[in-house]
């Protein structure tokens, strides 16, 4: 729960201070002190050895599987179980075969699965393949109504649509009510999948949390492959051990930084920040990237609270000017409580830069520009709050797409990604292309829809919900519905850009898609970052605390 109040620290409007008290960290130093989290060295080495043995067996499955449907099911299972980064070459080779196959004889399940697998990997596949499932009246044929497996496959495929692909919109509207009506009749494993993806479709799900949940579903299925199941559990446990080591390092850094203690009005959420990082990339190769990224977003979270929850307008102006200068000498113009934060911000960026290779250090300049841009936009929103100004939706989005952090945060995720993050990537991102704009729209609007009542109750600046209501003279319910439509359009933009990009690596585009997925999860029912004692705690426990018994 939050406690809100307004404090007047002077007579001028610019000196009104909001005071919002967030609940303290629910984790404390758990990931620093709890030595029982990690597996013993001997146990870890046994798991690593067994994983290598199982990897050989799975590679043999690719070689020995000539049936295309079996190959598609193998790839789908491997991806859902979080094993795909072990078999990138095998999957790419298999997808080339799948792309060439004649699918005219395929049923609903096979057609939808092929479409989804190919689209997920950036292949253009025509939606005309679904026309054979429609009758003369233009609707999907009624004989499909009882095919739960096929309907679920169609439902998940429909979320990879782009603009103009109306048949996928129709497929979504057709499949969802049918799945709901069939749910009580399904066997346990399929029912669990339907429930999971009706709550949030596959394309919008965070990978590492999906993997953790899907392993439990997969082990109950009659068609499970025990080699894949054992591999998935061991692999997850090894990943979890790595994550726990990383989180211990970042937690020690956070407590040494002491910002949560000195700025007690901010959200103390380092564990949640790290979990957020995992939603963008969970592969072991990105360990260094995750440490960099965690530091950046934890500092941005503090900035957000300074501008949004505590700082007076004059203090926000002073901080913005200091950040624009980006020099230690700029602290002279800051109030005491901001001097420490400002120096820690500069020092952290300097330390990150020192960790980079010589030919990568330029990346920090792009990240600094992102910080400066978000500070300017935060200041504008602070003015709206003080003045009780409700901007038009267009004016709102001009600033709030930046303050959503959905441009800065993915940019930060590129910094430690090695050779794939070229200067061209940073130039492309800085130009605010459609893929970045779509990512920002998804994050901004989902945040506003979920947080509207809470933030209005404490006197925050107007959200996009209020701006839409003012522009169109409508109520909150209708405004949220229309804004949700904008989110769906943004997803189609992102899907389109995922297919169209030729000069930007798919690994970069995946960061934007994954960040958008994290927004869908965090704002599914409430702001799980701010109110982290709710569903967020359970998700973190699943991913970072509870290992699979093996």
UniProtKB/Swiss-Prot annotation:
Mg(2+) 3 binds at residue 455. It is found in: Cytoplasm. GO terms for cellular component: cytoplasm. GO terms for molecular function: magnesium ion binding; terpene synthase activity. Keywords: Cytoplasm, Lyase, Magnesium, Metal-binding. Pathway: Secondary metabolite biosynthesis; terpenoid biosynthesis. Its cofactor is Mg(2+); Mn(2+); Co(2+); Ni(2+). It comes from Zingiber officinale. InterPro entries: Isoprenoid_synthase_dom_sf, Terpene_cyclase-like_1_C, Terpene_cyclase_plant_C1, Terpene_synth_N, Terpene_synth_N_sf, Terpene_synthase-like, Terpene_synthase_metal-bd, Terpenoid_cyclase/PrenylTrfase. Pfam families: Terpene_synth, Terpene_synth_C. GO terms for biological process: diterpenoid biosynthetic process. Mg(2+) 2 binds at residues 304, 308. It comes from the Eukaryota. This is (+)-germacrene D synthase. Involved in the biosynthesis of germacrene D. Can use farnesyl diphosphate as substrate, but not geranyl diphosphate. Produces mainly (+)-germacrene D along with germacrene B and a number of minor by-products. Belongs to the terpene synthase family. Tpsa subfamily. Magnesium, manganese, cobalt or nickel, but not zinc or copper. Binds 3 magnesium ions per subunit. Disulfide bonds: none annotated. The Asp-Asp-Xaa-Xaa-Asp/Glu (DDXXD/E) motif is important for the catalytic activity, presumably through binding to Mg(2+). A motif (DDXXD motif) lies at residues 304-308. The keyword Nucleotidyltransferase does not apply. It catalyses: (2E,6E)-farnesyl diphosphate = (+)-germacrene D + diphosphate. Optimum pH is 7.5-8.5.
